[in-house]
Amino acid sequence: MLSDKSTVCPINLLDIANNKRGAKAAIVNAGKKLPMLSIMDSVKERLITPVLIGDEIEIKKTAEDLKFDISDFEIINEPVENNTAKVAAKLAGDGHVKIIVKGHIHTDILMKEVLLRKYNLIGKKRLSHIWHMTLDKEDKPLIITDGALNVNPNVKTKMHILKNVIDFCHRIKISKPKVSILSATEEVLDSMQSSLDAKEICELAEKESLNADIFGPLAFDNSVSKKSAEIKGIK
């Protein structure tokens, strides 16, 4: 996270995305340099057809500065940040776009709008946030959930989060993911709710065919470091 190396999307994810090439994507508040660079990369790989939402003058100026030709793409002029989220949610609700991409906008503003039922974007499953990371000298990704969406989730919500991430793993060709239900300890303690939740989640998961190896409670260091787990006698 503190690395100054260029961010590169893993080849295997690009290969999977190839099956969905050219999907229309609403870029929410697209006028800043960072989201525009991401759009450039995505267009270069022919992954999306962007619909650029934001201040039209700023969008065109940023693209021009980056020598990025956006003349073929739809631009919706909306200079007010909060309103860009409304435009994107309506486009998705109406079926005009298949994907909503967060540009230069606060997450809470975007999600507050997307979650409104009037747009019909919410299905039966609870939404959750998934953070996919690739690490140097590692051939397996590290995936963390939920880091940004559900606040103080109970066991029922955590089960939704668990099923969402397992489904995501299966979709990116991880046939049987290893899942750690995190707590600050490996012991089940009455004084630590997260450890009690982890135990209950593992028990519930055993009763369902989730096609994943699920362990918990486990501390984060023991989940990501084999050496750390060995020191604590965890196999």
Tell me what each language-model feature is:
Residues 1-52, 56-235:
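Anion-binding alpha/beta catalytic cores of soluble intermediary-metabolism enzymes, centered on
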